[in-house]
Regions:
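Positively charged n-region of N-terminal signal peptides that target proteins for export
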Residues: 38-43
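Bacterial N-terminal signal peptides
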Residues: 46-53
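Long, acidic (Asp/Glu-rich), low-complexity accessory segments flanking structured domains
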Residues: 59-113, 126-156, 160, 295-379
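Hydrophobic faces of well-ordered beta-strands that scaffold small-molecule active sites
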Residues: 118-120, 161, 213
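Conserved, mostly hydrophobic/aromatic
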Residues: 121, 163, 339
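Surface-exposed substrate-engagement region within the catalytic domains
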Residues: 194-333
Length: 379
């Protein structure tokens, strides 16, 4: 959340600090005849280099606990929260390379980059619950993913997380599908009071230190999170979907956009317009109306017809869409809702198996922009 003055100091710091190690290396060469001076200069050089690294990394300091600045009385529905689509793919996949990866950071690193909403899609393999993306199994189990998030909540109790759940049933047989409600319910029960109770007008104070589960599929023992109804993948989304409290059946209106396959020029235009439209809806939504807006998608086709979820396709989508969305994010403080994206927390990624040039995806800038749109805390 840099002011112009902070940005100026940052530039001055780079200008001043970067040449200093070079200067000291030159002076060091003049001191070779004196053992004491040489040792002293080496020590000074090491300190300066460490200071430079610390200075640069300090620009992201605070993102691991950015919610500390949000007033307790603010409604969760009125926040701007960066999210990671298929968040566990950054942990690695048990599959052929080149397919299905939507993140380059693991879950812990996503948290540290400012992400607070995690799209996790458990599926049963034999009798165990792993996170999947379609038919592709990640290297992390559902319980392990929750453990990583809960560890961050222990470390940063001012924060909370939102976990968006969906059964990724493509890889499951009938027997495995029958186990899903029980295994998901059991994993959530194991985190105890860290699971937040949903209400349409819940405040930040109600959520701090907890995980809010919003699920597209019911599971056993649902008492704290909420069930989503009316989800679709059309270019228009659904501005009248519902979030239904598991505790008492209270219903909140949900505005949701998840148009995930912009595989030609017409569909790409539809995608960017849909994202911007739901950003506008979020900015005007009254308290208690929730917004989930997916920037994610893939843009690769096979022989011009069948869409394929290649890793390069997700990168390509992020590279063209994220700059357009950033241009449309007006300056000022206004709600954006929960904004799910690919390659959150990083600005540049390698091209991968299907594309040799790197992609500029602006995921770090996008996360920061979403966070910075939150209102200034009350005095």
């Amino acid at each position: 959340m840099e002011t112009p003055l902070e940005a100026a100091f940052y530039c001055m710091g780079i200008i001043i600090l970067v040449p200093l190690p070079l200067l000291f290396r030159f002076l060091l060469s003049l001191c070779n005849q004196c053992c004491f001076l040489m040792t002293y200069m080496r020590l000074l050089l090491a300190i300066l280099q460490l200071s430079l690294v610390s200075f640069v990394y300090a620009q992201d300091a605070g993102l691991e606990r950015w919610m500390m600045e949000i007033d307790d009385r603010v409604a969760v529905s009125s926040l701007s929260i960066p999210g990671a689509h298929d968040a566990a793919t950054g942990e690695g996949l048990h599959s052929l390379p080149g397919f299905g990866v939507t993140q380059s950071l693991d879950i812990k690193s996503l948290w540290e980059s400012g992400v607070r909403a995690f799209d996790l899609r458990p599926a049963v393999k034999d009798t165990l619950l792993y996170i999947y993306h379609g038919r592709l199994r990640t290297t992390v189990s559902f319980s392990e993913a929750l453990g990583i998030i809960c560890a961050q909540l222990e470390r940063y109790p001012s924060e909370f997380a939102i976990v968006l759940l969906r059964e990724e049933s493509d890889s499951e047989n009938e027997s495995e599908r029958s186990l899903w409600p029980h295994l998901v319910g059991k994993a959530i029960q194991e985190i105890g009071n860290k699971a937040a109770v949903f209400s349409p007008d819940m405040k930040v104070a109600d959520a701090r230190g907890k995980v809010l589960f919003l699920t597209r599929n019911a599971y056993n023992g649902m008492e704290r999170g909420a069930l989503l109804a009316g989800w679709n993948h059309s270019k228009d989304g659904n501005a009248n979907a519902q979030i239904i409290s598991s505790r008492n059946g209270e219903v909140a209106r949900l505005q949701v956009q998840d148009y995930y396959a912009p595989t030609n020029a017409k569909k790409r235009l539809e995608k960017v317009e849909a994202v911007k439209h739901y950003l506008l809806l979020a900015s005007k939504a009254p308290e208690g109306v929730w917004t989930i807006n997916f920037l994610s998608g893939y843009s690769t086709t096979w022989l011009g017809c069948t869409p394929l979820a290649t890793t390069s396709g997700y990168k390509r989508n992020a590279a063209w869409l994220h700059p357009l969305v950033l241009e449309g994010m007006e300056n000022g403080k206004h709600p954006m809702g929960i904004v799910f994206m690919d390659y959150a927390g990083v600005d540049r990624v390698d091209g991968g198996l299907w594309h040799w040039k790197p992609f500029n995806v602006y995921g770090r800038e996008l996360v920061r922009t979403v966070i910075e749109s939150n209102s200034v805390p009350a005095e």
